[in-house]
Amino acid sequence: MSDFDPAEPKSGNPDRRDFLGGLAAALGAAAVAGGAAETAEAKPAKGSSSRPVSDAKLRAAIDTVVVIFAENRSFNNLFADFPGLQQPLSEVPAERTRQRDRDGKVMEKLPKIWEGLVPSKQVVEHTEYLIGPDDLAPIPNGPFALKTPEGDPLPHGLVTRDLVHAFYHNQMQINGGANDQFVAWGDSGALVMGHYGDMRAQLRMWQIAREFTLCDNFFMGAFGGSFLNHQYLIAAQPPFYPDADKSPAAKRIAKLEGDDPKGTRLKLDPKTPASAIDGPAVFGPNTLSPDFWAVNTMLPPYAPTYELDAAKPGYANADSAHTLVPQQHKTIGDMLSAKGVDWAWYAGGWNAALEGRMNDASFPSRPNFQPHHQPFNYYDRFAPGTADRAKFLRDGGEGSTARTNKFLADAEAGKLPAVSYYKPQGNLNMHAGYSDIDAGDRHIAAVIDALRASPQWEKMLIVITFDENGGWWDHVAPPKGDRWGPGTRIPAVIVSPHAKKGTVDHTIYDTGSIARFLTRRFGLEKLEGLKMREDAMLAAGGVAPGDLTGALDIA
């Protein structure tokens, strides 16, 4: 199973001048994320942008940076009442958590969980589970701890149903910062409001966070899903599809309310029920914006991918509506290479996918490789046969031991490059619908153990974070930014001998803060998208996102 849907989310490159012009226009658009909402009092995140640390001391302290990029969890979903939070969920007034229907009225109760909480039969700890839409009692309007029909905490080893997580949906759910229409514009009914209530004792990541630094104001860089947030991680901008209206992808261009191509609201299909109580909203295509930015999932132009060119080995089918044209704009990889800084993207299951083994017949499927989670594979600089592809795009192997996992083997041998991105294979990434919390949590804990035992540990900084919220609700209003984000709050843990110990860092960060840290530590040219985001947030009266140094204790 994959989170790529060749249809649309079922709720229901330009040259430098064009890039700067498009992003500059985005700054002028009204951002929906952090503005005061008419329907509820939004309580935005507050925090300083960074802690003063001299560049010289930073260079002396950190030689190796590792980014572990997991999948699809909001901050509340995993860390709702972690000790020391600025805005713990249990202290949020009920009126700030109530969801509003499509007509803007407060809902009397939440809908059923459409398709069921656990729609596929599974066995966890010798107990069989199959939890359908009618198996849970009516759920009051507000956040709730995920439980079985018997009232026990939902086992972390269960794969729940997936939730829609997409660019326009996320903005409509955030609703100007009120975060009160996650149910209305989601596709899973009540499930968006669920969280795991027993993490203190069960989640290994909690223990890692308690030892090091948890960031409680870290927001996903872009509204929406995995594809766009992986691109934001490395480029701080969406990909662009020139002349998309004349391309095979023409029918995937979004239809919005009004005539503004920079609009934020999808046009509703007439078949949409008036109330979310009666079923999910129905929308038309929305992969590309009307001005041709790729904002929802498209597939890479190169293998590994789902639709290959039979006549051109290593390449995708360019005539497919799902294939994105190769991109040319700058990424953090370009900036690192320009400075002579070694780096790599380790993709779990990469070689398996190239060999045709993306999945197996089990559930959850293994390794369940996700082509759209490999952001550098969209750029012509890394096309098949190039030296850069061979050097920088690496197979991460499979599993959680150095015998089978090549990233762990390099860590154990002290051979990681100065900057390493690690993307776990699909069944170990925590993505609802095809992965479970426990498998991903155990895997990340094993990775952290290996990194702490590495010869490179003493001068290492590790960022554990998630690409996006996966459709799950969070109560903290994202700061007002630019056209692309920031979106919903997500977890981030900073692990390092130089991280503050037992600390919750309240600094405002977004996914781009990782690139900001790399830019500062290695003296890189700054990506244009990072500058745009900083300018937009300052212009909105907020602070620019920090560069992660607020989580460090460097004397």
Where are these regions (language model features)?
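N-terminal pro-sequences and low-complexity stem/linker regions of secreted or lumenal proteins
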Residues: 2-555
